[in-house]
Amino acid sequence: MLDRQTQIEMLVDHFKRPRHKGLLEGADAVMPGGNPGCGDLVTMHVKADPDGRVEAVSFEGEGCTISQAAASILADRINRTHPTLDEVMDFPYERMIDMLGKDVVGFRERCATLALGTLKMAAKRIQVHRRLREAGRSDQEIRDLERALMDSRNEPGLVFGEAAEEQRGVGGAER
């Protein structure tokens, strides 16, 4: 485990020089996520192979040092380990906080886990879309169903999908 000073230096480094930031050509899912409490926004781009293993991840975002550094650290880890979509879904939020440093994150757990929550939603989107296509659903039917589900399933304190896009420019201080 890293000491507090090393954890802070790691966060600042990832904030100033983010890894895997930008668009991902050919992404299977592009999922925006936001934290209305402080205005953090992260959009995760995910590409997965036909067997459900993550090939690549990138992110776009704006917000506090913790949320943006966490997105960079998470993308870097995923691009090194190439987990399955199920493994992404099972990745514990507590583990993300531990990676960043529990005492460094303090009470900013939503900032620290925004990228992970958004990545999990992207992984779920890929899984659901693939199952629905296998069942013969059209792209329009999938979009309509997804819109209805996203409106009802946002976690308290975090928003995903269209709700995160609507948050852009609302409620957050400039960073």
Predicted regions and their residues:
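C-terminal binding/interaction regions
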Residues: 1-25, 30, 76, 84-175
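Structured beta-strand/loop patches that form or line metal/cofactor-binding pockets in enzymes
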Residues: 13, 17-56
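Short, thiol/selenol-centered motifs that function as redox-active sites or metal-ligating centers
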Residues: 38, 61-69
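Solvent-exposed residues in well-ordered beta-strands and their adjoining turns
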Residues: 47-49, 60, 79
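Short connector loops/turns at beta-strand edges and beta->alpha or beta->beta junctions
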Residues: 49-53, 64, 93
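Catalytic-loop motifs flanking and including active-site residues across diverse enzymes
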Residues: 66-71, 111-114
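Flexible, solvent-exposed short loops/turns enriched in glycine
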Residues: 69, 82-85
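Short, small-residue alpha-helix embedded
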Residues: 70-78
